[in-house]
């Protein structure tokens, strides 16, 4: 299985390439550029670096956020632009689900996932011990942090 996965939902760009079920490229970098100016180029260069042709990709995974609406739309457009002409499956994923599933299974307490949005703004979601959501993904400012702890689950 060959998979191209990338995330344009935050200022931290991430890309991973799985080739023959092995991770051959995994990069995360904070970028001070607009995704629309470099995304297709960096995706193509990453495939070249991994010695993988786009036609050999079985699936493209793209982040659906939460995060920058514009960044998410650019990522989806790039995934479609690369995937549709080659009939590649395109799947979206939620960053909160990725985060909660990275928590050690030994932890038997509720988990709050938090993703930075802009300067002092964040997204969060509360999950139970079975990693099921107790709340919807919500937005808060750091200035309202005390109110966050009043949420009933």
Go through the PLM ranges and name each one:
Residues 1-64:
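N-terminal beta-alpha supersecondary unit
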Residues 11, 65-66, 117-120:
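Short glycine-rich anion-binding loops that position phosphate/pyrophosphate groups of nucleotides
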Residues 14, 70, 121:
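Glycine/Thr-rich phosphate-binding loops of Rossmann-like dinucleotide-binding domains
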Residues 18-19, 74-77, 106, 126-129:
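Short, glycine/charged-enriched secondary-structure capping and boundary segments
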Residues 22-23, 77-83, 121-127:
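Short, basic/glycine-rich phosphate-binding loops at helix/coil junctions
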Residues 59-95:
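DPxDG-like acidic metal-binding loop motif
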Residues 89-91, 96-153:
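Surface "functional belts" at beta-alpha junctions
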């Amino acid at each position: 299985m060959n998979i191209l996965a990338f995330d344009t939902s935050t200022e931290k760009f991430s890309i991973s390439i799985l080739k023959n079920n092995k991770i051959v490229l995994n990069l995360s970098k904070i970028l001070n550029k607009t995704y629309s100016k470099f995304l297709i180029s960096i995706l193509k260069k990453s495939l070249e670096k991994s010695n993988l042709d786009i036609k050999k990709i079985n699936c493209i995974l793209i982040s659906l956020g939460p995060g920058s609406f514009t960044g998410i739309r650019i990522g989806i457009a790039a995934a479609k632009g690369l995937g549709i002409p080659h009939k590649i499956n395109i799947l979206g994923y939620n960053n909160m689900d990725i985060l909660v599933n990275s928590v050690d299974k030994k932890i038997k307490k509720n988990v709050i996932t938090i993703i930075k949005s802009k300067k002092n703004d964040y997204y969060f979601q509360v999950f139970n011990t079975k990693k099921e959501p107790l709340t919807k993904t919500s937005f808060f400012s750091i200035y309202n942090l005390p109110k966050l702890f009043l949420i009933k689950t």
